[in-house]
């Protein structure tokens, strides 16, 4: 019998944490599972609500600290979208995003855009870039067909 997918993911997460000298706490395992189960870009508040029933003692600072650890380990990506709350992406692989100015939805784009030009411009300005993300802004197809304009 095959192990449930979330169990396999938890084993892999625990191995990654241990390999980096970190403990695989129940909070870390649950937060990672919640982000994967939401299957979308989520805020720390949304993750706190998604885990509240199973871990009522979990606090928002712990959620943020855990997400930052996951980002450091390459397990999630922070998505820079406007001035709203930070969104966390369960897909750490390189990809771009589209953010709707009308409904706020953020979706993955599968186009492969090279960040080399932006990185070179940052270096030319004296900065030391270590990564780049592209977020395309506009009105999503659902809002556009409903007549939304921004």
Locations of the language-model features?
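A short acidic, leucine-rich amphipathic alpha-helix
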Residues: 46-52
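Basic amphipathic alpha-helical segments that dock to polyanions
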Residues: 63-73
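Short, leucine-enriched amphipathic alpha-helices that occur as contiguous helical runs
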Residues: 10, 27-28
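Non-DNA-binding regulatory cores of transcription-related proteins
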Residues: 72-150
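Pre-recognition alpha-helix immediately N-terminal to the DNA-recognition helix
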Residues: 29-34
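Short, Lys/Arg-enriched N-terminal segment that forms or immediately precedes the first helix
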Residues: 8-21
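Short capping segments at the starts of secondary-structure elements
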Residues: 24-26, 37-43
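Short coil turns linking two alpha-helices in DNA-binding domains
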Residues: 59-60
């Amino acid at each position: 019998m095959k192990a449930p997918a979330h169990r396999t993911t938890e084993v892999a997460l625990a191995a990654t944490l241990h390999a980096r000298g970190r403990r695989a706490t129940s909070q870390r395992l649950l937060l990672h599972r919640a982000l994967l189960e939401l299957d979308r870009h989520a805020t720390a508040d949304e993750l706190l609500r998604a885990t509240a029933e199973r871990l009522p003692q979990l606090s928002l600072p712990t959620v943020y600290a855990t997400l930052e650890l996951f980002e450091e380990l390459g397990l999630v990506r922070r998505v820079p979208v406007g001035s709203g709350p930070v969104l966390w992406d369960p897909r750490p692989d390189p990809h771009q995003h589209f953010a709707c100015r009308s409904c706020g939805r953020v979706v993955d784009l599968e186009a492969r855009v090279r960040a080399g030009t932006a990185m070179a411009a940052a270096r030319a300005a004296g900065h030391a870039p270590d990564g780049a993300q592209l977020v395309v802004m506009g009105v999503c197809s659902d809002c556009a067909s409903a007549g939304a304009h921004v």
